[in-house]
């Protein structure tokens, strides 16, 4: 692991942490000056669980969630978020719900689509879209449009 990475811990939950690296990084669509390494949060269950608990706090008492749409390999975080939001022991608006966690597919042009077996989990539901980062917002806007369609 590069020694220049710095641990960034949540003030709400010190167990929820990510690594970041300052510098100049370019993608085909954007330039950023901080790289945030989300790989451990997305793949290690302890990191994902703590991150999900911290993220879910923002939605517990004010947002009903029926479905979580996971973008960019955030399914593990999404599953733990669903568990936290549906937990009947907290004051969640979604307590007791069987929250669906789905991942969209992409066609050959890059359009987001939901197969028939997932559409019933989207249509007429309260949907939370989860992503690991948002440099331009293009993918998130595509996801919003697909959910609303």
Regions found by a protein language model. Give the residues of each.
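PRPP-associated nucleotide enzymes
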Residues: 1-149
């Amino acid at each position: 692991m590069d020694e220049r990475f710095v641990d960034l811990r949540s003030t709400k939950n010190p167990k929820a942490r990510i690594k970041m690296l300052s510098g100049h990084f370019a993608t085909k669509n954007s330039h950023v000056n901080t790289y945030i390494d989300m790989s451990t949060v997305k793949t290690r269950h302890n990191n994902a669980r703590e991150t999900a608990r911290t993220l879910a706090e923002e939605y517990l008492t004010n947002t009903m969630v029926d479905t979580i749409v996971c973008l960019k390999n955030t399914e593990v975080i999404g599953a733990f978020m669903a568990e936290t939001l549906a937990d009947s022991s907290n004051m969640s608006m979604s307590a007791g719900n069987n929250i669906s966690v789905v991942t969209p597919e992409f066609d050959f042009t890059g359009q987001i689509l939901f197969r028939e077996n997932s559409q019933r989990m989207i249509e007429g539901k309260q949907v939370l879209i989860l992503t690991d980062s948002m440099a331009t917002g293009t993918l998130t806007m595509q996801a919003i449009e697909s959910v609303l369609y």
